[in-house]
Amino acid sequence: MQQSPQMIPMVLPSFPPTNNITTEQIQKYLDENKKLIMAILENQNLGKLAECAQYQALLQKNLMYLAAIADAQPQPPAATLTSGAMTPQAMAPNPSSMQPPPSYFMQQHQAVGMAQQIPPGIFPPRGPLQFGSPHQFLDPQQQLHQQAMQGHMGIRPMGLNNNNGLQHQMHHHETALAANNAGPNDASGGGKPDGTNMSQSGADGQGGSAARHGGGDAKTEGK
């Protein structure tokens, strides 16, 4: 309690200008503020409210003086920003920077245009986008059905499959058998006289016999 009256004359003198303040003086005011706080706590415990109010007024003046010194000092954050410190605005992504540059869209447009100018002969058309004749995209079953229909109509593609080759051989075999069966019939037909030849030969025989009979009659009349 004896130290508190000694602290009051230390803070009563006027404060020096804030422009000429040194770090040692600032540290001195900080130490005095610490002592004032300790004195205020002791007086509160003892119930001396008047002394507490006096020390609180001195503490408030010291704090305001230190705040004025801080405001008078040059702002160091400007130097830290130039050295590469990131501010919240710098850390936030810029929406315009996330968008691709206009040259990107130009390159994409040129690539699409070049793809449309490629002649169709270089790359064969494929996919469901080609709306040509329906026979261009037939599945294997429909192709086999068309080939079978062509086979019935007499248009047999050579080398279609093994079944067509077997059918072709069977067709030749049946033709050969039919030719062999027709040979004996023709031969027997050639050996047998038909009805016209038989009738002609009969008529010739009858004519000859009639002539011979007429000759016999003439001879008897001459006698």
From Swiss-Prot:
List the GO molecular function terms.
Answer: transcription coactivator activity
| Bias-annotated ranges (Basic and acidic residues) | 214-223
The reply to whether Transcription regulation figures as a keyword in the UniProt entry is yes
One of its GO biological process terms is:
cell division
Region Disordered, as annotated, extends over: 179-223
Q: Which UniProt keywords apply?
A: Activator, Transcription, Transcription regulation
The record's account of tissue expression is: Predominantly expressed in shoot tips containing the shoot apical meristem (SAM) and flower buds. Also expressed in mature flowers.
Q: Which Pfam families match?
A: SSXT (PF05030)
Report the domain of life of the source organism: Eukaryota
The record lists its disulfide bonds as none
Cellular-component GO terms for this entry: nucleus
The subunit field of the Swiss-Prot or TrEMBL record says: Interacts with GRF1.
Q: Which family does it belong to?
A: Belongs to the SS18 family.
- Job description of the protein: Transcription coactivator that plays a role in the regulation of cell expansion in leaf and cotyledons tissues. Component of a network formed by miR396, the GRFs and their interacting factors (GIFs) acting in the regulation of meristem function, at least partially through the control of cell proliferation. GIFs are involved in the positive regulation of cell proliferation of lateral organs in a functionally redundant manner.
How is this protein named in the record?
GRF1-interacting factor 3
Task: State the encoding gene.
Answer: GIF3
